[in-house]
Regions:
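Bacterial N-terminal signal peptides
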Residues: 6-15
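N-terminal leader/targeting segments and the immediately adjacent pre-domain N-terminus
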Residues: 17-115, 143, 198, 371, ...
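Active-site SXXK
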Residues: 103, 120-146, 170, 227-231, ...
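Catalytic-site signature segments of enzymes, centered on catalytic residues
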Residues: 116-117, 184-264
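Active-site helix/loop module of the DD-peptidase/beta-lactamase fold
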Residues: 121, 140-178, 206, 233-271
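Active-site-proximal alpha-helical segments within enzyme catalytic domains
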Residues: 223-230, 270-294, 339-355
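Active-site-proximal binding-pocket segments
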Residues: 242-244, 248-310
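Active-site Gly/Thr loop motif
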Residues: 255-256, 303-351
Length: 389
């Protein structure tokens, strides 16, 4: 399931905006095929390799106050073997890890030459950000409801495969439209669909509908980029500017971020490639945890938006509005090569991770990460309630 993550965007060849010898060689090949050296040099420098739109740092940073709780003595068991966080970093080629508990900073660590000032590519974590921007657009009155037809805001969809598809169907990956996300098949949709968004909209409108909307889950990267186009049409603005207005500035993001475009001065990909620091990814998790509240009584999301976003769809019990759901009530934004924002409302826990896995998706690394996060949660609870004494 999760191995079919967003890589459609990663076959870019024409989006080069700046290059030295190394960066030029990297731009000429899919991000999926970057060497380990290229990953570590490229992931923090996407804005120097591809066309992006800047999202300026907030004028007033939300401080991540250090908590009294610490993880220095933390160990956990994975596959019957004792592990430390250092083991996790080494075995999963992790570049950064931040843990927030009750809104305070419990742990922060970097490796592989990464640091708190560098941005890092999100891959499909951007989808969850788009989901929250949809909530903001509803709160602002640009969109009336997720039950509206997508074609209400993007009339070109009124004919073709998406003529009766709602925004909710698209957010839940349940449009019923045929889409092949097999990356090993060169004739698949994910490998052959257009890179430019306007061409993609036409391409997707000509696809076949296999199932009634809302009845079947099918991971569809092209559709998430379509979601970006619908949102852009509804708000009458680009996604990066709207993200700055609704989240980045008012919530106090510390650093500039960058969102990849389909061409120079083009449009953002709704399904991929926001680039931000790990601290600001953690703040995005905190923003979700706080239901978009910017200050007491002042929020940029509808009251129940995050509850609805993290509720199972009829088509898939493990998926909400571009968030992957966990059995324990937590949810996460997930990107290939090991990018995560975990949000656990009951435990008031946020975990943000930057990685450079050797493959786009590895189930064993996913299982290890889940074990790490659950073990951290249990460890902190024992600390809080003095259960180790």
């Amino acid at each position: 399931m999760l191995k079919h993550f967003c890589v459609w965007i990663l076959c870019l060849y024409g989006a080069l905006s700046w290059s030295a010898d190394l960066f030029e060689s990297m731009s000429a090949k899919s991000l999926l095929t970057w060497t380990p050296e290229q990953q570590l040099k490229g992931y923090p420098n996407i804005h120097r390799i591809y066309h992006t739109r800047k999202i300026g740092a907030s004028s007033k940073t939300l401080d991540l106050t250090s908590a009294n709780l610490r993880l220095e003595d933390f160990t956990y068991i994975h596959q019957k073997q004792p592990k430390t966080i250092d083991d996790y970093f080494e075995e999963l080629n992790t570049a950064g890890l931040i843990v927030l508990k009750n809104g305070e900073l419990v742990f922060e660590k970097y490796a592989l030459g990464h640091d708190e000032k560098q941005t890092w590519i999100s891959f499909s974590v951007a989808k969850s950000v788009v989901s929250m921007l949809y909530g903001a657009a509803i709160k602002d009155g640009y969109i009336e409801s997720v039950n509206d037809l997508a074609s209400t805001y993007l009339p070109s969809l009124s004919e073709g495969a998406y003529n009766d598809t709602t925004i909710k169907n698209i957010l839940q990956m349940a449009s019923g439209v045929q889409w092949n996300e097999d990356y090993e098949d060169l004739d698949s949709d994910v490998a052959s669909s257009p890179i430019q968004i306007l061409d993609l909209i036409e391409y997707m409108g000509n696809l076949k509908k296999l199932n009634p909307p809302g009845t079947h889950f099918n991971y569809n990267t092209g559709e998430t980029n379509l979601a970006g186009a619908v949102l852009r049409a509804a708000i009458g603005n680009n996604l990066a500017t709207y993200l700055h207005k609704k989240i980045w500035e008012p919530f106090g993001m510390e650093s500039d971020a960058y969102w990849m475009l389909d061409e120079a001065d083009g449009v953002e990909y709704g399904g991929c490639c926001l680039n931000a620091t790990l601290r600001d990814y953690a703040r995005l998790g905190l923003y979700a945890l706080r239901h978009g509240e910017l200050s007491p009584g002042n929020g940029s999301l509808p009251d129940n938006w995050m509850l609805d976003s993290a509720s199972p769809s009829e088509a898939a019990g493990y998926y909400g509005y571009y968030w992957w759901l966990r059995p324990n009530g937590s949810y996460r934004a997930t990107g290939i090569f090991g990018q995560f924002i975990w949000v656990h409302p009951r435990e008031q826990l946020v975990v943000a991770i930057h990685s450079a896995w050797d493959k786009a998706w590895r189930d064993d690394h996913d299982e290890h990460t889940a074990k790490l996060v659950s073990s951290i949660s249990n460890h902190l609870n024992r600390k809080i309630f003095n259960l180790d004494e």
